[in-house]
Amino acid sequence: MNTQILILATSAFLCVRADKICLGHHAASNGTKVDTLTEKGIEVVNATETVEQKNIPKICSKGKQTIDLGQCGLLGTIIGPPQCDQFLEFSANLIIERREGNDICYPGKFDDEETLRQILRKSGGIKKENMGFTYTGVRTNGETSACRRSRSSFYAEMKWLLSNTDNGVFPQMTKSYKNTKREPALIIWGIHHSGSTAEQTRLYGSGNKLITVWSSKYQQSFAPNPGPRPQINGQSGRIDFYWLMLDPNDTVNFSFNGAFIAPDRASFLRGKSLGIQSDAQLDNNCEGECYHIGGTIISNLPFQNINSRAIGKCPRYVKQKSLMLATGMKNVPENSTHKQLTHHMRKKRGLFGAIAGFIENGWEGLIDGWYGYRHQNAQGEGTAADYKSTQSAINQITGKLNRLIEKTNQQFELIDNEFNEIEKQIGNVINWTRDSIIEIWSYNAEFLVAVENQHTIDLTDSEMNKLYEKVRRQLRENAEEDGNGCFEIFHQCDNDCMASIRNNTYDHKKYRKEAIQNRIQIDAVKLSSGYKDVILWFSFGASCFLFLAITMGLAFICIKNGNMRCTICI
């Protein structure tokens, strides 16, 4: 009877499940992958796209003082062809140039056109001041059918000076203008190249013509070059425009004896603006700070893959269409194989048997925190998130996107338009430089994101380690690590006890005596799997030896007492 009681008690003891607490992290079967410095395609719980690909096909002008130049070219606002009459003076912080816009009416070109265009794009608008030039002995009303209003006319801001009579003498003249303003003045003038020598003589008289312009920082002489050219707008002549920025209190002087297109008013820049070239429709219902020829880029991302020539407060252009920034930890979802393994192991080791490493594996459904606990005890099983470690990781990860933006965003200016023959070389250099910058920034972007991803994954693993160490230091000798991110507790630990472990208020001294007793009992019956077979064979051999000894002893006694006779025949 006593033997039966002992066997039942031992069986009952072995069947009791040990209380256990495990640590893990959130997992989600989402397929979100990022690249790090050392590995590509690492799946993470959360990630944010850093490359903008969405374009608004409109010019978002809400909240901006916008001017749409329409048929007027930006440079035309300085010299005043008929199509620019309404834009001779304006104020704006967003200037829109259209493809149909034209800077001139009489054929010609601007010297250093792109520099002048950049100045005007950033000008904030134009205001003008009369230069006060008066003329005697010449006509100031030169006009052409190429610049028609109701009839033949000329540039509104320029004077075409002609001899008083056809073939008449053009007197030598000198005119001066002093800039009395506090800001630089934009001064522009023209040189007329007649369609023939005969035409030049008719307009300005015979002899060589020379125009000289000088200031404290500028000096240049110009000689007209008459001759036949292909007709444009019915004209075989050309007018080339030149310009300078005149400092405050400086004086510009003009000396000429014909073929001179004189300025009438000096231009002053109003402030700051953004100039764009686009045929996209204006939209006053949306706001934007980054523009390109196809519309507006509205994004708070650090990179964009829409247009390499976007201007304004824009994300950096990169060649990559996607660069994912990790904002969560490494993800190991509970796939079907994992769940089948979990079910199989639960039969042997309970709820937590499937966990093969608390950093490498996660739990789906832990949505209220990144890190958490699972426990089992006499009251059942439970899961709880750890908010402190979660918040610590989030605080360090939050702002990664903003830091990338700070490293990459800046105001871009558009250096792009038509170049004359000499400026084409400059244009090629600009384009080559731009392409090189794109290559560099595409590499930099990939590197920056990879560095941040590496840091994020290392950081989240580090927080997991901290949480694990916190639990281990609390439990001390009252529990044993099982190597799978779990602790087997050697005393009864109810839900309040489990909560104290999670809250870092666990008192290991309170349970020490019970834990030591249970540890001794458990250690006494624990057998390492490597010695089980040896012990079994030893036990079997000892049993056989004992059985043989008893049998031989009984036989010897029986023979001695005459109860058994042994006959040996030879």
UniProtKB/Swiss-Prot annotation:
Site positions (Cleavage) are: 349-350
Which membrane topology term applies here? Single-pass type I membrane protein
Q: Which residues lie on this side of the membrane: Extracellular?
A: 19-533
Kindly list the GO CC terms recorded for this protein.
Answer: host cell plasma membrane; membrane; viral envelope; virion membrane
Q: Which residues are glycosylated?
A: 30, 46, 249, 253, 335, 431, 503
Keyword Disulfide bond recorded: yes
Stored Gene3D superfamilies: 3.90.20.10, 3.90.209.20
Q: Which residues lie on this side of the membrane: Cytoplasmic?
A: 555-570
Q: Which residues form a coiled coil?
A: none
Key words of the record:
Clathrin- and caveolin-independent endocytosis of virus by host, Clathrin-mediated endocytosis of virus by host, Disulfide bond, Fusion of virus membrane with host endosomal membrane, Fusion of virus membrane with host membrane, Glycoprotein, Hemagglutinin, Host cell membrane, Host membrane, Host-virus interaction, Lipoprotein, Membrane, Palmitate, Signal, Transmembrane, Transmembrane helix, Viral attachment to host cell, Viral envelope protein, Viral penetration into host cytoplasm, Virion, Virus endocytosis by host, Virus entry into host cell
User: What terms describe the molecular function in GO for this protein?
Assistant: host cell surface receptor binding
For this UniProt entry, which segments traverse the membrane? 534-554
Name one matching Pfam family. Answer: Hemagglutinin
Q: Where is the lipid attached (S-palmitoyl cysteine)?
A: 566, 569
Subunit-structure text: Homotrimer of disulfide-linked HA1-HA2.
Further facts? Major glycoprotein, comprises over 80% of the envelope proteins present in virus particle.
HAMAP family registered for this protein in UniProt: INFV_HEMA (MF_04072)
Identify this protein by name.
Hemagglutinin
What organism is recorded for this protein? Influenza A virus (strain A/Equine/Detroit/1/1964 H7N7)
At the highest ranks, the source species' classification is: Viruses, Riboviria, Orthornavirae, Negarnaviricota, Polyploviricotina
